[in-house]
Amino acid sequence: MSTEEVSDAMGKTGVVKGSKPIAKGQFAVGVVQYVYTYLDSNWAIHEQIRDLRKDVIVFVDDINVTDKALFGQLVSRFIIQKKNAKAIVTKGWMRDVQGMIEDGTMVWCKDITPIGCFNKKEEITPEIEQIMKKNREYYDGSIAVCDDSGVVIIPKELITEEFLEKLKFLHNQESVWFDCVMNKNWDTYDTVCLKKYKDESSK
């Protein structure tokens, strides 16, 4: 199941804007555990990743972080190899990317930079705490689907049998479209817009 199909099933929503893989050909899906940091510091990340659950996708929220890497190879190794998480997703920046690629670490992030956050404890403000609580409610316990196109989040309220059936329908429809265009030599207008295959199936 691709991120495109999942997003389509949610009315073309759910994308983690700007988050892309550091290496091609990777795929991960799993329950999200939410981690956050703020104000150009990664102190809070070090605190929270001690308590990661196994087999989760770690979503790292960067609140008021100004184009600095949240962490690099050391922390990613701890998250993946020691805490047994599946993958790391963030809308923020990362560093030590060559090392993470060599490790085979699956990471989706906004961009890369050699400049990292400060390892300094910062006091959380009421405004940041409010943002954190809102984002934690949305991300924690949701499902992340990650591939070469990016990351899509399935909110907790959509984790239902009904939504699963919708995903299956769209996946099958995609197969029908490819069959019509590639094997039956239809054009995309007849296939996608007019859906003429429905007329064939009703005969």
Q: Over which residues does each language-model region extend?
A:
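Conserved beta-strand-loop-short alpha-helix elements that form
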Residues: 139-151
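Feature captures the catalytic cores and cofactor-binding loops of soluble hydro-lyases/lyases
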Residues: 1-140, 154-188, 192-203
